[in-house]
């Protein structure tokens, strides 16, 4: 089952299953997690996507896509400004805020298991949809 927390995963016993579930449901990449960490440390700041992109060492276009994903999952909000899109940490409810706080704690104490959990996630439907438009040679490769 997609997004299911494995009972035999090395992260078990280190990170609570509900935090694992939050990661699987809400965090699609290390870039998203690192963006949340930065924005959470200055929650009243509107961060231009170009600034976050620079700090995350990713392209601005990629950064906007990652941040838009966080908006859809209720973790940040966005607004259009003269300089482009800006984002601010603003979980849509207290439960999400609490889960982010817990994730920050476990990520700071168990970086590798959390990173492995994120990297081990099944590909998202968006990636699968994008792959459908990848040009292929006549032999299908």
Regions found by a protein language model. Name each.
Residues 5-34:
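Short alpha-helical segments that sit at the start of domains
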Residues 26-28, 80-103:
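Short, cationic-aromatic polyanion-contact patches
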Residues 25-29, 40-45:
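Short helix-capping/hinge SLiMs at alpha-helix to coil transitions
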Residues 57-73:
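Short amphipathic alpha-helical interaction segments
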Residues 2-12, 82, 88-92, 131, ...:
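Long, charge-rich, low-complexity intrinsically disordered regions
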Residues 108-141:
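Exposed, interaction-prone assembly regions rather than primary DNA-binding/catalytic cores
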Residues 35, 48-55:
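A short acidic, leucine-rich amphipathic alpha-helix
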Residues 71-83:
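A short, conserved structural fragment
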